[in-house]
Amino acid sequence: MAASDTERDGLAPEKTSPDRDKKKEQSEVSVSPRASKHHYSRSRSRSRERKRKSDNEGRKHRSRSRSKEGRRHESKDKSSKKHKSEEHNDKEHSSDKGRERLNSSENGEDRHKRKERKSSRGRSHSRSRSRERRHRSRSRERKKSRSRSRERKKSRSRSRERKKSRSRSRERKRRIRSRSRSRSRHRHRTRSRSRTRSRSRDRKKRIEKPRRFSRSLSRTPSPPPFRGRNTAMDAQEALARRLERAKKLQEQREKEMVEKQKQQEIAAAAATGGSVLNVAALLASGTQVTPQIAMAAQMAALQAKALAETGIAVPSYYNPAAVNPMKFAEQEKKRKMLWQGKKEGDKSQSAEIWEKLNFGNKDQNVKFRKLMGIKSEDEAGCSSVDEESYKTLKQQEEVFRNLDAQYEMARSQTHTQRGMGLGFTSSMRGMDAV
Protein backbone atom coordinates (compact mmCIF):
# COMPACT_ATOMS: atom_id res chain seq x y z
CA MET A 1 0.00 0.00 0.00
CA ALA A 2 2.85 2.35 0.81
CA ALA A 3 4.34 1.78 -2.63
CA SER A 4 1.05 2.60 -4.35
CA ASP A 5 0.73 5.85 -2.37
CA THR A 6 4.17 6.92 -3.40
CA GLU A 7 3.36 6.16 -7.01
CA ARG A 8 0.22 8.29 -6.81
CA ASP A 9 2.22 11.07 -5.23
CA GLY A 10 4.70 10.83 -8.03
CA LEU A 11 1.99 10.92 -10.65
CA ALA A 12 0.19 13.84 -9.10
CA PRO A 13 3.03 16.31 -9.45
CA GLU A 14 3.50 15.14 -13.01
CA LYS A 15 -0.14 15.94 -13.77
CA THR A 16 0.02 19.29 -12.08
CA SER A 17 3.22 20.33 -13.84
CA PRO A 18 1.61 21.11 -17.22
CA ASP A 19 -1.01 23.29 -15.44
CA ARG A 20 1.75 25.18 -13.78
CA ASP A 21 3.55 25.65 -17.03
CA LYS A 22 0.43 27.09 -18.64
CA LYS A 23 -0.14 29.47 -15.75
CA LYS A 24 3.48 30.56 -15.88
CA GLU A 25 3.23 31.25 -19.56
CA GLN A 26 0.01 33.21 -19.00
CA SER A 27 1.56 35.24 -16.18
CA GLU A 28 4.62 35.97 -18.30
CA VAL A 29 2.44 36.99 -21.21
CA SER A 30 0.45 39.32 -18.91
CA VAL A 31 3.33 41.78 -18.99
CA SER A 32 2.44 45.12 -20.66
CA PRO A 33 2.13 45.00 -24.45
CA ARG A 34 5.05 47.30 -25.05
CA ALA A 35 7.41 45.21 -22.89
CA SER A 36 6.25 41.91 -24.43
CA LYS A 37 7.89 42.71 -27.73
CA HIS A 38 11.36 43.25 -26.29
CA HIS A 39 11.36 40.49 -23.65
CA TYR A 40 9.70 37.70 -25.55
CA SER A 41 12.86 35.58 -25.97
CA ARG A 42 13.86 35.93 -22.30
CA SER A 43 10.46 34.82 -21.05
CA ARG A 44 10.69 31.72 -23.26
CA SER A 45 14.07 30.66 -21.84
CA ARG A 46 12.83 31.18 -18.28
CA SER A 47 9.72 29.12 -18.92
CA ARG A 48 11.87 26.24 -20.18
CA GLU A 49 14.08 26.33 -17.07
CA ARG A 50 10.99 26.32 -14.86
CA LYS A 51 9.63 23.30 -16.74
CA ARG A 52 12.81 21.37 -16.00
CA LYS A 53 12.72 22.30 -12.32
CA SER A 54 9.09 21.27 -12.04
CA ASP A 55 9.91 17.89 -13.63
CA ASN A 56 12.73 17.35 -11.12
CA GLU A 57 10.44 18.24 -8.25
CA GLY A 58 7.84 15.72 -9.49
CA ARG A 59 10.45 12.98 -9.60
CA LYS A 60 11.57 13.69 -6.06
CA HIS A 61 7.91 13.23 -4.94
CA ARG A 62 7.37 16.62 -3.32
CA SER A 63 4.10 17.28 -1.62
CA ARG A 64 1.25 19.54 -2.84
CA SER A 65 1.83 21.99 -0.07
CA ARG A 66 5.38 22.48 -1.23
CA SER A 67 4.22 23.16 -4.77
CA LYS A 68 1.69 25.74 -3.49
CA GLU A 69 4.41 27.62 -1.63
CA GLY A 70 6.56 27.63 -4.76
CA ARG A 71 3.68 29.07 -6.75
CA ARG A 72 3.27 31.89 -4.27
CA HIS A 73 6.97 32.74 -4.45
CA GLU A 74 6.85 32.73 -8.23
CA SER A 75 3.77 34.97 -8.33
CA LYS A 76 5.56 37.47 -6.02
CA ASP A 77 8.62 37.48 -8.28
CA LYS A 78 6.43 37.98 -11.32
CA SER A 79 4.54 40.87 -9.73
CA SER A 80 7.85 42.61 -8.88
CA LYS A 81 9.00 42.11 -12.47
CA LYS A 82 5.72 43.55 -13.73
CA HIS A 83 6.14 46.66 -11.59
CA LYS A 84 9.68 47.16 -12.92
CA SER A 85 8.60 46.75 -16.53
CA GLU A 86 5.69 49.17 -16.04
CA GLU A 87 8.01 51.80 -14.53
CA HIS A 88 10.39 51.33 -17.44
CA ASN A 89 7.56 51.79 -19.95
CA ASP A 90 6.31 54.88 -18.11
CA LYS A 91 9.77 56.45 -18.36
CA GLU A 92 10.01 55.69 -22.06
CA HIS A 93 6.53 57.05 -22.86
CA SER A 94 6.32 60.01 -20.45
CA SER A 95 5.45 62.33 -23.39
CA ASP A 96 2.10 60.49 -23.92
CA LYS A 97 -1.17 61.80 -22.49
CA GLY A 98 -2.49 60.95 -18.99
CA ARG A 99 -5.41 59.09 -20.41
CA GLU A 100 -3.18 56.60 -22.24
CA ARG A 101 -1.16 55.92 -19.06
CA LEU A 102 -4.28 55.11 -17.04
CA ASN A 103 -5.63 52.91 -19.82
CA SER A 104 -2.35 50.99 -20.11
CA SER A 105 -2.13 50.28 -16.35
CA GLU A 106 -5.80 49.26 -16.14
CA ASN A 107 -5.51 47.13 -19.24
CA GLY A 108 -2.48 45.37 -17.75
CA GLU A 109 -4.33 44.37 -14.59
CA ASP A 110 -7.45 43.31 -16.50
CA ARG A 111 -5.36 41.25 -18.85
CA HIS A 112 -3.56 39.55 -15.95
CA LYS A 113 -6.89 38.48 -14.43
CA ARG A 114 -8.27 37.29 -17.74
CA LYS A 115 -5.16 35.24 -18.47
CA GLU A 116 -5.31 33.52 -15.10
CA ARG A 117 -8.93 32.53 -15.86
CA LYS A 118 -8.31 31.36 -19.42
CA SER A 119 -6.00 28.46 -20.09
CA SER A 120 -5.15 28.33 -23.78
CA ARG A 121 -1.92 28.87 -25.64
CA GLY A 122 -3.50 29.98 -28.95
CA ARG A 123 -5.34 32.87 -27.31
CA SER A 124 -2.12 34.28 -25.85
CA HIS A 125 -0.64 34.50 -29.34
CA SER A 126 -3.71 36.39 -30.62
CA ARG A 127 -3.52 38.81 -27.66
CA SER A 128 0.10 39.58 -28.40
CA ARG A 129 -0.85 40.35 -32.00
CA SER A 130 -3.68 42.63 -30.87
CA ARG A 131 -1.23 44.46 -28.61
CA GLU A 132 1.10 45.00 -31.53
CA ARG A 133 -1.80 46.37 -33.59
CA ARG A 134 -2.83 48.71 -30.79
CA HIS A 135 0.72 49.91 -30.45
CA ARG A 136 0.83 50.65 -34.20
CA SER A 137 -2.52 52.43 -34.10
CA ARG A 138 -1.35 54.62 -31.21
CA SER A 139 1.82 55.57 -33.08
CA ARG A 140 -0.31 56.48 -36.12
CA GLU A 141 -2.59 58.60 -33.96
CA ARG A 142 0.44 60.44 -32.58
CA LYS A 143 1.68 61.16 -36.10
CA LYS A 144 -1.77 62.38 -37.14
CA SER A 145 -2.05 64.65 -34.11
CA ARG A 146 1.40 66.12 -34.89
CA SER A 147 0.43 66.75 -38.52
CA ARG A 148 -2.84 68.36 -37.39
CA SER A 149 -1.01 70.67 -35.00
CA ARG A 150 1.35 71.68 -37.84
CA GLU A 151 -1.62 72.38 -40.14
CA ARG A 152 -3.27 74.48 -37.44
CA LYS A 153 -0.11 76.53 -37.01
CA LYS A 154 0.08 77.05 -40.78
CA SER A 155 -3.60 78.08 -40.97
CA ARG A 156 -3.11 80.54 -38.11
CA SER A 157 -0.13 82.10 -39.84
CA ARG A 158 -2.12 82.35 -43.10
CA SER A 159 -5.07 83.98 -41.33
CA ARG A 160 -2.69 86.51 -39.73
CA GLU A 161 -1.20 87.34 -43.13
CA ARG A 162 -4.71 87.77 -44.60
CA LYS A 163 -5.73 90.08 -41.76
CA LYS A 164 -2.61 92.16 -42.33
CA SER A 165 -3.33 92.40 -46.07
CA ARG A 166 -6.94 93.41 -45.36
CA SER A 167 -5.87 96.14 -42.95
CA ARG A 168 -3.40 97.45 -45.57
CA SER A 169 -6.08 97.50 -48.27
CA ARG A 170 -8.50 99.32 -45.94
CA GLU A 171 -5.88 101.97 -45.22
CA ARG A 172 -5.31 102.41 -48.98
CA LYS A 173 -9.07 102.75 -49.57
CA ARG A 174 -9.33 105.40 -46.86
CA ARG A 175 -6.48 107.37 -48.43
CA ILE A 176 -8.15 107.12 -51.86
CA ARG A 177 -11.50 108.29 -50.42
CA SER A 178 -9.90 111.26 -48.66
CA ARG A 179 -8.16 112.24 -51.92
CA SER A 180 -11.41 111.90 -53.88
CA ARG A 181 -13.24 114.14 -51.37
CA SER A 182 -10.64 116.88 -51.71
CA ARG A 183 -10.79 116.62 -55.49
CA SER A 184 -14.60 116.70 -55.67
CA ARG A 185 -14.65 120.29 -54.32
CA HIS A 186 -12.82 121.58 -57.41
CA ARG A 187 -14.64 119.39 -60.01
CA HIS A 188 -16.80 122.18 -61.45
CA ARG A 189 -13.78 124.31 -62.42
CA THR A 190 -12.35 122.38 -65.36
CA ARG A 191 -13.41 119.46 -67.54
CA SER A 192 -9.90 118.14 -68.03
CA ARG A 193 -9.56 117.46 -64.31
CA SER A 194 -12.74 115.38 -64.25
CA ARG A 195 -11.46 113.32 -67.19
CA THR A 196 -8.14 112.61 -65.48
CA ARG A 197 -9.93 111.63 -62.27
CA SER A 198 -12.21 109.20 -64.08
CA ARG A 199 -9.16 107.64 -65.76
CA SER A 200 -7.34 107.29 -62.44
CA ARG A 201 -10.43 105.67 -60.93
CA ASP A 202 -10.56 103.14 -63.77
CA ARG A 203 -6.90 102.32 -63.14
CA LYS A 204 -7.52 101.84 -59.43
CA LYS A 205 -10.45 99.53 -60.17
CA ARG A 206 -8.24 97.45 -62.46
CA ILE A 207 -5.57 97.21 -59.78
CA GLU A 208 -8.08 96.20 -57.10
CA LYS A 209 -9.63 93.34 -59.14
CA PRO A 210 -6.86 90.70 -58.54
CA ARG A 211 -6.90 91.54 -54.81
CA ARG A 212 -10.56 90.59 -54.65
CA PHE A 213 -9.78 87.18 -56.13
CA SER A 214 -7.07 86.61 -53.51
CA ARG A 215 -9.49 87.49 -50.71
CA SER A 216 -12.01 84.90 -51.88
CA LEU A 217 -9.69 82.16 -50.55
CA SER A 218 -10.49 83.13 -46.95
CA ARG A 219 -13.23 81.22 -45.14
CA THR A 220 -15.27 84.25 -44.05
CA PRO A 221 -16.58 86.28 -47.05
CA SER A 222 -15.46 89.89 -47.02
CA PRO A 223 -18.26 92.51 -46.74
CA PRO A 224 -19.19 94.44 -49.92
CA PRO A 225 -17.54 97.85 -50.30
CA PHE A 226 -19.55 100.98 -49.48
CA ARG A 227 -20.42 102.65 -52.79
CA GLY A 228 -22.58 105.54 -51.59
CA ARG A 229 -19.81 108.10 -51.95
CA ASN A 230 -18.88 106.86 -55.42
CA THR A 231 -22.48 107.35 -56.62
CA ALA A 232 -22.48 110.88 -55.20
CA MET A 233 -19.27 111.64 -57.05
CA ASP A 234 -20.78 110.30 -60.27
CA ALA A 235 -23.85 112.49 -59.78
CA GLN A 236 -21.63 115.56 -59.33
CA GLU A 237 -19.75 114.72 -62.52
CA ALA A 238 -23.04 114.33 -64.41
CA LEU A 239 -24.22 117.73 -63.16
CA ALA A 240 -20.98 119.36 -64.27
CA ARG A 241 -21.35 117.81 -67.73
CA ARG A 242 -24.94 119.02 -68.02
CA LEU A 243 -23.92 122.55 -67.08
CA GLU A 244 -21.20 122.51 -69.72
CA ARG A 245 -23.65 121.28 -72.36
CA ALA A 246 -26.17 123.98 -71.41
CA LYS A 247 -23.47 126.65 -71.73
CA LYS A 248 -22.56 125.40 -75.20
CA LEU A 249 -26.20 125.40 -76.30
CA GLN A 250 -26.64 128.96 -75.03
CA GLU A 251 -23.57 130.09 -76.95
CA GLN A 252 -24.87 128.46 -80.14
CA ARG A 253 -28.28 130.11 -79.73
CA GLU A 254 -26.70 133.50 -79.17
CA LYS A 255 -24.66 133.08 -82.34
CA GLU A 256 -27.78 132.13 -84.30
CA MET A 257 -29.66 135.15 -82.95
CA VAL A 258 -26.83 137.46 -83.96
CA GLU A 259 -26.81 135.97 -87.45
CA LYS A 260 -30.59 136.40 -87.78
CA GLN A 261 -30.36 140.03 -86.69
CA LYS A 262 -27.70 140.64 -89.30
CA GLN A 263 -29.86 139.03 -91.96
CA GLN A 264 -32.87 141.14 -90.97
CA GLU A 265 -30.79 144.30 -91.11
CA ILE A 266 -29.58 143.33 -94.56
CA ALA A 267 -33.16 142.58 -95.66
CA ALA A 268 -34.40 145.94 -94.33
CA ALA A 269 -31.63 147.71 -96.18
CA ALA A 270 -32.55 145.83 -99.35
CA ALA A 271 -36.25 146.77 -98.88
CA THR A 272 -35.51 150.46 -98.51
CA GLY A 273 -33.16 150.55 -101.47
CA GLY A 274 -33.02 148.36 -104.55
CA SER A 275 -31.92 144.80 -103.90
CA VAL A 276 -29.71 144.75 -106.95
CA LEU A 277 -28.07 147.96 -105.90
CA ASN A 278 -27.48 146.63 -102.34
CA VAL A 279 -25.92 143.42 -103.61
CA ALA A 280 -23.77 145.42 -105.98
CA ALA A 281 -22.79 147.71 -103.10
CA LEU A 282 -21.86 144.70 -100.95
CA LEU A 283 -19.77 143.25 -103.77
CA ALA A 284 -18.08 146.59 -104.28
CA SER A 285 -17.32 146.92 -100.58
CA GLY A 286 -15.55 143.56 -100.67
CA THR A 287 -17.77 141.60 -98.30
CA GLN A 288 -18.54 138.01 -99.23
CA VAL A 289 -22.13 137.53 -100.50
CA THR A 290 -23.43 134.25 -99.00
CA PRO A 291 -26.54 132.47 -100.39
CA GLN A 292 -28.49 133.57 -97.29
CA ILE A 293 -27.78 137.23 -98.04
CA ALA A 294 -28.87 136.73 -101.66
CA MET A 295 -32.18 135.10 -100.56
CA ALA A 296 -32.87 137.94 -98.12
CA ALA A 297 -32.31 140.46 -100.93
CA GLN A 298 -34.79 138.64 -103.20
CA MET A 299 -37.49 138.52 -100.50
CA ALA A 300 -37.03 142.22 -99.79
CA ALA A 301 -37.57 142.95 -103.48
CA LEU A 302 -40.85 140.98 -103.49
CA GLN A 303 -42.11 142.82 -100.39
CA ALA A 304 -41.37 146.18 -102.00
CA LYS A 305 -43.29 145.15 -105.15
CA ALA A 306 -46.36 144.01 -103.10
CA LEU A 307 -46.32 147.24 -101.12
CA ALA A 308 -46.28 149.27 -104.32
CA GLU A 309 -49.24 147.34 -105.80
CA THR A 310 -51.51 146.85 -102.77
CA GLY A 311 -50.28 149.34 -100.24
CA ILE A 312 -50.03 146.62 -97.52
CA ALA A 313 -46.60 145.85 -96.04
CA VAL A 314 -45.65 142.60 -94.29
CA PRO A 315 -45.02 143.27 -90.56
CA SER A 316 -41.53 142.73 -89.12
CA TYR A 317 -42.55 139.93 -86.74
CA TYR A 318 -43.11 137.60 -89.74
CA ASN A 319 -40.26 135.69 -91.29
CA PRO A 320 -39.79 137.28 -94.75
CA ALA A 321 -38.51 134.00 -96.22
CA ALA A 322 -41.64 132.08 -95.11
CA VAL A 323 -44.40 134.62 -95.99
CA ASN A 324 -45.51 135.50 -99.53
CA PRO A 325 -46.20 139.28 -99.49
CA MET A 326 -48.87 139.17 -102.27
CA LYS A 327 -51.03 136.54 -100.52
CA PHE A 328 -50.69 138.34 -97.22
CA ALA A 329 -52.01 141.56 -98.87
CA GLU A 330 -55.10 139.72 -100.27
CA GLN A 331 -55.94 138.26 -96.84
CA GLU A 332 -55.74 141.67 -95.23
CA LYS A 333 -58.19 143.09 -97.80
CA LYS A 334 -60.73 140.35 -97.05
CA ARG A 335 -60.46 140.98 -93.32
CA LYS A 336 -61.16 144.68 -93.79
CA MET A 337 -64.26 143.93 -95.91
CA LEU A 338 -65.65 141.56 -93.29
CA TRP A 339 -65.09 143.66 -90.22
CA GLN A 340 -65.87 147.14 -91.49
CA GLY A 341 -69.22 148.83 -90.62
CA LYS A 342 -72.27 148.71 -93.00
CA LYS A 343 -72.71 151.70 -95.26
CA GLU A 344 -76.14 153.49 -95.44
CA GLY A 345 -77.57 152.65 -98.87
CA ASP A 346 -80.64 151.28 -100.71
CA LYS A 347 -82.25 148.21 -99.23
CA SER A 348 -83.41 145.32 -101.38
CA GLN A 349 -87.12 144.63 -102.05
CA SER A 350 -87.17 141.38 -100.06
CA ALA A 351 -85.77 143.19 -97.03
CA GLU A 352 -88.47 145.82 -97.25
CA ILE A 353 -91.25 143.16 -97.54
CA TRP A 354 -90.04 141.34 -94.42
CA GLU A 355 -89.76 144.55 -92.51
CA LYS A 356 -93.32 145.66 -93.40
CA LEU A 357 -94.90 142.24 -92.72
CA ASN A 358 -98.01 142.47 -90.49
CA PHE A 359 -99.62 139.52 -88.68
CA GLY A 360 -102.72 141.45 -87.58
CA ASN A 361 -101.42 141.59 -84.03
CA LYS A 362 -98.88 144.01 -82.64
CA ASP A 363 -97.36 141.49 -80.22
CA GLN A 364 -96.75 139.01 -83.02
CA ASN A 365 -95.23 141.68 -85.22
CA VAL A 366 -92.77 142.70 -82.45
CA LYS A 367 -91.76 139.11 -81.79
CA PHE A 368 -91.17 138.41 -85.48
CA ARG A 369 -89.01 141.50 -85.94
CA LYS A 370 -86.92 140.60 -82.92
CA LEU A 371 -86.37 137.09 -84.23
CA MET A 372 -85.40 138.34 -87.70
CA GLY A 373 -83.20 141.14 -86.33
CA ILE A 374 -85.20 143.94 -87.98
CA LYS A 375 -84.97 147.36 -86.39
CA SER A 376 -88.26 149.20 -85.65
CA GLU A 377 -88.90 151.95 -88.24
CA ASP A 378 -92.66 152.65 -87.93
CA GLU A 379 -92.59 156.24 -89.09
CA ALA A 380 -90.47 155.55 -92.11
CA GLY A 381 -92.57 152.51 -92.96
CA CYS A 382 -95.89 154.42 -92.92
CA SER A 383 -94.67 157.18 -95.18
CA SER A 384 -93.03 155.01 -97.81
CA VAL A 385 -95.82 152.46 -98.37
CA ASP A 386 -96.82 151.83 -102.00
CA GLU A 387 -100.13 150.58 -103.30
CA GLU A 388 -98.77 147.21 -104.43
CA SER A 389 -97.11 146.55 -101.16
CA TYR A 390 -100.26 147.56 -99.33
CA LYS A 391 -102.26 144.92 -101.26
CA THR A 392 -99.78 142.20 -100.49
CA LEU A 393 -99.82 143.10 -96.83
CA LYS A 394 -103.62 142.80 -96.69
CA GLN A 395 -103.54 139.42 -98.36
CA GLN A 396 -100.96 138.22 -95.81
CA GLU A 397 -103.13 139.41 -92.95
CA GLU A 398 -106.14 137.45 -94.24
CA VAL A 399 -104.10 134.30 -94.70
CA PHE A 400 -102.72 134.52 -91.20
CA ARG A 401 -106.21 135.07 -89.73
CA ASN A 402 -107.60 131.99 -91.48
CA LEU A 403 -104.68 129.91 -90.26
CA ASP A 404 -105.25 131.03 -86.67
CA ALA A 405 -108.99 130.14 -86.84
CA GLN A 406 -108.27 126.69 -88.24
CA TYR A 407 -105.61 126.11 -85.59
CA GLU A 408 -108.02 127.01 -82.80
CA MET A 409 -110.74 124.65 -84.12
CA ALA A 410 -108.30 121.77 -84.42
CA ARG A 411 -107.09 122.43 -80.96
CA SER A 412 -110.61 122.37 -79.50
CA GLN A 413 -111.34 119.03 -81.20
CA THR A 414 -108.18 117.24 -80.23
CA HIS A 415 -107.73 118.56 -76.72
CA THR A 416 -111.17 119.60 -75.33
CA GLN A 417 -114.03 117.84 -77.29
CA ARG A 418 -112.06 114.77 -78.28
CA GLY A 419 -113.90 113.93 -81.54
CA MET A 420 -114.38 110.21 -82.43
CA GLY A 421 -113.61 108.41 -85.67
CA LEU A 422 -111.54 109.74 -88.55
CA GLY A 423 -112.84 113.30 -88.09
CA PHE A 424 -115.73 113.29 -90.60
CA THR A 425 -118.34 114.55 -88.17
CA SER A 426 -120.71 117.50 -87.74
CA SER A 427 -117.91 119.52 -86.23
CA MET A 428 -115.99 119.42 -89.50
CA ARG A 429 -119.14 120.60 -91.35
CA GLY A 430 -119.39 123.47 -88.93
CA MET A 431 -115.83 124.42 -89.82
CA ASP A 432 -116.71 124.50 -93.48
CA ALA A 433 -119.65 126.80 -92.73
CA VAL A 434 -117.37 129.10 -90.85
Swiss-Prot record:
There is a cross-link at residue 375 (Glycyl lysine isopeptide (Lys-Gly) (interchain with G-Cter in SUMO2)). The modification Phosphothreonine is found at residues 6, 16. The modification Phosphoserine is found at residues 4, 17, 30, 32, 104, 376. GO terms for molecular function: RNA binding. Residues 1-27, 66-111 have a biased composition (Basic and acidic residues). There is a cross-link at residue 375 (Glycyl lysine isopeptide (Lys-Gly) (interchain with G-Cter in SUMO1)). Residues 35-51, 112-214 have a biased composition (Basic residues). PANTHER family: ARGININE_SERINE-RICH COILED-COIL PROTEIN 2. This is Arginine/serine-rich coiled-coil protein 2. The lineage of its organism: Eukaryota, Metazoa, Chordata, Craniata, Vertebrata. The gene is RSRC2.
